[in-house]
Amino acid sequence: MDIYSYNACVQQWADALFRFAYKCTGHEEDARDVVQGAFEVLWQKRGDVQQEKAKAFLFQVTYRQSVDNYRKKGKIVYKEAERTDLTHPQNPDLKKILDKALAQLDEQSRALVLLKDYEGYRYEEIAQITGLNESQVKVYLHRARKVLKAYLVNVENII
């Protein structure tokens, strides 16, 4: 990967990486640090990373650095960045309900749900990012969605 390809990766993936890191860390500064660290690792390994695989590589590094951040600080918080489709003015509490539902999941399940359902990644891409195989991703997502469904259909959790 040359400097032009690297710069293209920065322009193309910086925002998506920041959103993902922010959802994982819950803090803007931590998210910026994680994204910067991911791009530093890409720069250091630019000779080994192919342009086509840069996206998966960056998300994998971001995911791992978010986990490292969790270990250092002892807590990981998944937050949903402002999204007009989820935070419509008629449903201001929907974001809070969804955040509480996501908080019911373990760290790995939250990451999988965020990558698949919020960011729209394919199972194959999620497997590359997390180091799981596709079957594991599908099983863990299915289980996570069952937990979310059970939480969301409970009236006490919504009121």
Over which residues does each language-model region extend?
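Structural recognition of an alpha-helix C-terminal capping motif at a helix-to-coil junction
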Residues: 19, 33-40, 44, 52-64
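A short, charge-rich alpha-helical start-of-domain segment used by transcription regulators
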Residues: 1-19, 32, 110
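Residues within helix-turn-helix
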Residues: 29, 124, 135
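Amphipathic, Lys/Arg- and hydrophobic-enriched alpha-helical face
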Residues: 9-28, 44-45, 102
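A short pre-motif secondary-structure segment
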Residues: 112-116
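Arg/Lys-rich amphipathic alpha helix in sigma70-family domain 2
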Residues: 60-80
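DNA-recognition helix of helix-turn-helix
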Residues: 130-154
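Short amphipathic alpha-helical boundary/capping segments
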Residues: 97-105
